[in-house]
Amino acid sequence: MDASISNSINTADRASYITNESTPLHNVKLKDEGYKYIIGTFGIVTLIITIGLGVAINKDPGEVSFGSGIAADRSVCTEAGNEIFMKGGNSVDVAVAVTVCLGVVFPHLTGIGGNGVLLVYNHKTEKILMCLDSWPPAGTVVVPQLMLALYTAHSSFGHKSWSIILEPAIRIAREGFQVSESLIQSLKHLSPNANDDLKNWLHSLKLGTVIKSPQLAETLAVIQDKGVEALYTGSLNDELGKYFDSKSLSEPSLNKEPCSEAIGKGYRLISSGVGTAGPSLLNSLVDSNFSNSFSVQELADFLIGKEELSWPLPSGVVVSVTDKDDNYVSIVSGLGPVLGSQNLLKDGYIVGSLLHRSNLSRINSFGAPFIATTLQHKCEKRIVTGGVDLRDMLQVLPKILWGSEGVVNSVEAARVRITENSLLAEINHPPVLPFSLPPASMPYPVINVIQKRGDEVLAYDDSRSL
């Protein structure tokens, strides 16, 4: 593995360009496996609302390297991923390291106590290597299985040792990291029923100060040394045992449903499988008339009669990684809502939602990873991304795939948060409308994107990561 890497930077442009990809791609015949769902009509939104971005964003080239890219929520975790690249790691190694790191610096959104969905794909062979979903069936107890999913992916495809992969996150937890705006904003989601440890910790935080997480560092060190089994049946079992019975902890399992695939509008589209938002996402992209300029009405028409319209607003993080061997990885992880179950354990992490909404009989995960590759010219355009909420992805992906704005403007364009009863505007990305919308609570879901065109790579971090 080549040690040369790139930085997806968190500055004004937040983008990196990487060139000199050296390996030709193979051509294979693709299958057409679309997903069909019933789409009704929708009357909650009567006005056509076009989502747009009023100010163009200037882009400034970043570092040059050999086809590797990282798009993630925090620069400190991107640097952790770069560290793994420099040690000879591949995209799976890096994506796992970055995701674990985000559990340290964004503990209100993801971490050991959460779950996730991941997709691994190799573009040289055009083969899907892995789809994993750690969210259990809706209406059941949600045992935290994110670390199990990461460990499984790493065991299957990683190049470097598990110990090396966890080292950056452990170091950051021990040495400290800056309190982000996103973490401060999570106070707005604090429930009166939150445990005292979480309340006291959150109220002690100040924006921009450096804090340490020694308990979390020790927990990760145990997982580094003993493996993920320590969480469920080993020395770390006592804390989780307060919330989950021994049978649930002794029998963790991952959903290995096949990935969803579809062919449409010049692309091969790949996402996660049944039980996630993946099938509905691909169906919407293939069968819709979405373009680079579309209305909320068009999006709403897709949601009537679907469970997606009644989904709560989820939270989480998105990690997208590519390497010079054209391994593409997308990991979408979270705790459910911001702050999960509102229980901070003595082991230093927040437990995610303890129970899925029982009426969501079909969907376990509201988000999905996403990969798109052009059909006619395999090197023309490839997209690696994901999102924690289908409703956000449908406001961004059509622009990236078929619009003329480009990745940066598409990601930074205003979005509307859509719920069963209301439309909500993002505070820092307000839509241009003839009337005002109530504000959506921060922090907002991000969509971090890697785009490969020929031998050029653009890795872009959504500024909503704060």
Where are these regions (language model features)?
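Short, well-ordered strand-loop elements centered on a beta-strand within folded domains, enriched
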Residues: T125-S134, K247-S248, R268-I270, K378-G386, ...
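Structured, charged N-terminal subsegments at the starts of enzyme catalytic cores
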Residues: L231, D238-L282
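Cofactor-centric catalytic regions
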Residues: L236, S246, L254, S260-I263, ...
